Amino acid sequence: MLRRARPTTFAIFLVAALATASVCLGAEPKAKKLKPVPLPLLPATQEWIATLDDAPSAGGAMDAERVYVPLQSERIVALRRADGSRVWTRDIESKWPPVVIGDAVYIVASDEMHALDAATGTERWRVPFEHQLTAPLAATTSLATGGTERSLVAVADKGLVIAVAAADGRTIWMRELGALSRFTPALDDVRTFVALDDGRMVALRLMDGRVEWDQKLEGKLNQPSVSRDRVFVGTNTNLLYAFDNSSGRLAWRWKAGGDVIGTSADAKGGAYYASLDNVLRAVNRGNGNQRWIKEIPTRPLLAPLTLGDGVKYEEIVVLTGATSEIDAFAAKNGASVGMYQPPPGGDLEGPPLIDGDLKPYQVAMVVITRDGRVIGLKPSAMLLPEPALLPLPPELPGRRLERERVTPPATR
C-alpha cells in the first residue's frame, strides 16, 4: 500500500532538487567580501635620500610631485618626490614651514609673504608682512561658506589673527584677540579656531573674522583640531575638551594621565588623542565614551594623525615620538601595525610628510632630519618583492644527451 508523502517533506525535497539543479546549471556561489585591512603605510622602505646644502630652518611641505624645504642659509629648495632630485631653489629666508595650495607654495619671511609657482619656483606675488608669526600658517581646504576665495590664516604677535587671500596676498581681515597663540589654527569650512596663551579657545568666522564664540578653560592649551561638529583642545591640566563647533557649547571632557598634546578624528565617529603619560586613547567623537586605550613605546612629540578612508583601507593613527620613532596603530582597536625609525642621528625637523592615498611603488612618506637629510619612503606592502638571484647548479637536472654527429653525404 502506497503512503502519501506529507506536504512538508515534499517541499523540502523540492527545494533541495532546485538547489542542486541550479548548481548543475552553472550557478556560482557568492564570493565572500574581503574585509579592508589597516592602511599599509608602515613599515616603509627607503627609496631615496637627499643631502641638503644646509640644515633645514623648519619643517617642510609636500604635494603630489615635490617636497619643499626652507634652509638656514636663507633659501627654499624643491625636490622631486619620486627620486629626491633638486627641481629649483629660491633665495627666501623663513623659519616657518611652507604651505601648499593647489599649484602654489606660500612662504612667510621676516617681513614679507611670498607665493611661488610650485613647479618652477617663479614668483606669483610678494607682499609686505610686518607682523611676526607666532605659529605656522594654516590654509583653507576649500572655499569658506559664504566666501569666494581660498585663504591663508596667520597668528602673529599682539594677538593678531590675519586672513590673507591666496590669489594675490591681499589682507581680507584682521582680528586682535588680546593674547598670543603658539599653535596653528584649526579650520573647517566656516570658522577658524584659535587656542590662546591666556587659556581661551576662540572661534572666528572665516568670511569676515567675526568672533562667534569664546570659551575660557583651565591651564595652558595645546594644538586644537576640528572634525565635523566637534572642536578638540587639550591642556596641561591633563584634560581634553570637546566643543560644539558652531555654538561653543561644551560637549564633553576627558581626564588623562598627562598633558594632552593633540587630537585627530576619523570619518566613522572616532577621535584619538595622545598624552604625556605615554598613552594613546580612542573615544567616540560625539559623546567621549572610551573605545580603547594603548600604551605607546615612546613619549609622544606631535599630535596624532588619522589616515585612511574606512572603505578601501581601515583607518590608522600615526604618532611621532620624542625619539623620532613613527608608529602606526589600527584605529579600530589600537593594535600596532607598523613603525619607522630614521637612520642614526636623524632627529626629525617637523612632522613626517604623508600622502594617505597610497599607490604601488610610489613614495608616500618623506621625513626631514635636522642634520640636513631628506628621506623618501615607500610602503613595504605596496612593493612586489623581486625574486632572489640564485647561482646556477653545477649540474642541471635531467639526463645528459650525447651530441648527435651528422655525416655529410658523399659527393660524386
Please name every model-derived segment.
Residues A31-D54:
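A short helix->beta-strand "capping" segment at the edge of beta-propeller domains
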